[in-house]
């Protein structure tokens, strides 16, 4: 039971990390804004992969 909670939280946070930049991209729709959000998402993914080990 204890493993299920953190796993759900991680999935939720991952979804937020993926959805937030895409929503901001839809709102701004400028090529200059697309790059920073993708870089930020990439940094977050590396942080998540490091923390999981």
UniProtKB/Swiss-Prot annotation:
Q: Where in the cell is it found?
A: Cell membrane; Secreted, Extracellular space, Apoplast
Assembly: Interacts with MIK2 (via extracellular leucine-rich repeat domain); this interaction triggers the formation of complex between MIK2 and the BAK1/SERK3 and SERK4 coreceptors, and subsequent BAK1 activation by phosphorylation.
Keyword Membrane attributed: yes
The alphabetized UniProt keywords are: Apoplast, Cell membrane, Cleavage on pair of basic residues, Membrane, Secreted, Signal
Which Gene Ontology cellular component terms are annotated?
apoplast; plasma membrane
Residue ranges of the motif SxS motif essential for MIK2 binding: 49-51
Choose any GO biological process term that the UniProt entry carries and state it. Answer: response to wounding
Family designation: Belongs to the serine rich endogenous peptide (SCOOP) phytocytokine family.
- Signal sequence bounds: 1-26
Molecular function in Gene Ontology? LRR domain binding; receptor serine/threonine kinase binding
Q: What does this protein do?
A: Brassicaceae-specific phytocytokine (plant endogenous peptide released into the apoplast) perceived by MIK2 in a BAK1/SERK3 and SERK4 coreceptors-dependent manner, that modulates various physiological and antimicrobial processes including growth prevention and reactive oxygen species (ROS) response regulation.
Induction entry = Accumulates upon infection by generalist herbivores such as Spodoptera littoralis.
What protein does this entry describe? Serine rich endogenous peptide 3
* Motif residue range(s): SCOOP motif: 37-53
KW Membrane (keyword) present: yes
């Amino acid at each position: 039971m204890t493993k299920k909670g953190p796993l759900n939280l991680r999935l939720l946070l991952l979804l937020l990390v993926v959805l937030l930049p895409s929503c901001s991209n839809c709102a701004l729709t400028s090529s200059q804004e697309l790059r920073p959000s993708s870089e930020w998402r990439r940094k977050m993914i590396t942080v998540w992969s490091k923390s999981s080990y």
